[in-house]
Amino acid sequence: MVRVRAIHHSNIPKCLRCGRRWWATCHRCERTVRLTSTASGIWPLRLLRGAVPGLISGPWLPFSPTTRPIYALQLLSVNDGPSPVAGSAPNRLDNGASVARALPHPAGRLAVATQQTKAGLSRQAKAGTAFRVAPNAYIVGATLAPEQAVAHHRTAIISMFWPGSVLSDRTALTGGMPFEGWIFISHPDPARRSDLELPGVTVSVRVGPGPLPGDMPMPDGLHISGPARRLVENVSIAGRPPRGRPSRQAGTELVGDEIDQVARQGGAGAVHNVLSQLDAISNHLPAGSVGVVRSLLAGVLGSFSGSKLTSERLAARLSGEPYDEHRLSMFRGLAELLGDTAPEPRPALGSPQRWTWEPFFEAYFSNFIEGTEFGVEEAREIAIDGVIPSERPADAHDVVATYRIVSDPVSRAVAPASADELLDELRDLHRILLAARPEKRPGEFKERRNYAAGYAFVEPDLVVGTLRRGFDVFSSVTDPMQRAVALMLLITECHPFDDGNGRLARIISNGVLTAAGQVRIVIPTVYRNNYLAGLAGVSNGNGRGESLIAVLRFAQKWTAAIDWMTFEATDEQLRRLDSYMDPGLAEASGIRLRLPEQT
């Protein structure tokens, strides 16, 4: 039984085309008036005719001018009644089923032109309520653009022409999505062998196996190539490249990248699974391509005997130093940006005495950023006088170790000239920095992935390879400040150790500046959120690093403006500039880091 209540007749809108007031469809011009689907379920009366029992009672339903319901009924309850819209839902509605499920979809519905429906569909197409997408295929009632509507019905359209086909080749690598406007499929005996041009996409078919073990089902009876099959299908083959469309094969290099991704995400077990799938389907696929994939998979397991690899990622994995391609792409973007950015040298002017207390405050703020919080007077006693509080010896050692590194003339000027030097310096400095925390494994790269606020840093087995290749990416960056920015991002993104990574990134970056006679970068507490936001902007893909460059340049400018000659004068100046203020409180109060001349 269906219970409904009526909407007042005065709410019927006019036909969008001829202006006359009719029901869901104007009988004079056959132009359908749109309905707005709602969770409560507003259905046009014509569609409910035959499903509504004899009497319709109840109060008039108020309406919103924005929804403009056509002469309609609101469904109050459904109890195993017949579907009001033929063909748009199952023959019987489940108890409590949502009415919105049966309402028109913005992408319309796909209709096949038969002898009985061809004339009607043609009239609808002329009236603008339907459009032809392929021979004998129409989309009716769509409010979306043709390209968007076709994207919604893509698998159904493919199934109309090639039932049981497989989304294969390059399309399998894109998860079934078009590549440069093309979809590639295979079918054992295609009835249509020419390309099918649809709005926004062209479907290209080739003769090939139907679904094989490991292939995954898709809507409308289609399948998509499984992990092993899609690797084989995308191996480069000899021959002239096609004209007017991309190659069906992504190429052996991308196949190697895919295998590297399998090994990275699932380890040796995932590689073994793909090999097992390959054994099960090898008789259905080209032997040469199967051999290439088998050799690459075996190489990941330690028995590669093939020729030179075309995939740098897979070659790096087989050499024992896989890397994070996503991070390298990030580093390339920053390197390009730095190459297009004019340098702004800021030499450390004045006598050495002017910078006497800079190392202490740098160490103090660097630890405070990481959560090792002491009052500045207490931190002075710890770092300078060697007074270690009994209740926090490890925290005190963090301050002492950082101060020792940044105040030493040699370690404060570390500027690695090669990737090997960078790796050695990182390990050596980490041993000093975390000497009081043996549980953090000083000097040893991490064995578990680390996170910050849900953001995942480079995986442990990719750290060395990413550091090496990232250092090479930045080899073209020669300006000291720009190189400091680059190494800051490189070390931060890799996060190579269990702890102490932020302090190490700042130490190495400042070492590059000191070695070139430039002003170091101090990040006071009030500026912490700006600093982290600059790093997060690059991590999250919000630009190539523009905000990070701006943040670090201002911090360097601020550092150059402070007089670091005596503790008392420096402390008084920093307090006047609100440098010790909690960053959250500062943001809430509208306070920001200021230069001395701005006070």
Identify the residue ranges that each predicted region occupies:
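Flanking scaffold residues of small Cys/His-coordinated metal-binding clusters
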Residues: 10, 21
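Short Cys/His-rich metal-coordination motifs, predominantly Zn2+-binding knuckles/fingers
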Residues: 18, 29
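Minor-groove-contacting beta-hairpin "wing" of winged helix-turn-helix DNA-binding domains
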Residues: 137-142
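Short, intrinsically disordered terminal segments enriched in charged and Pro/Gly residues
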Residues: 2-6
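FIC/Doc superfamily catalytic core
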Residues: 44, 55-111, 118, 127-132, ...
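Cys/His-rich microdomains that often coordinate metals
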Residues: 22, 33
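Cys/His-enriched microdomains
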Residues: 13, 24-27
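Short, structured active-site "lid" loops
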Residues: 150-161
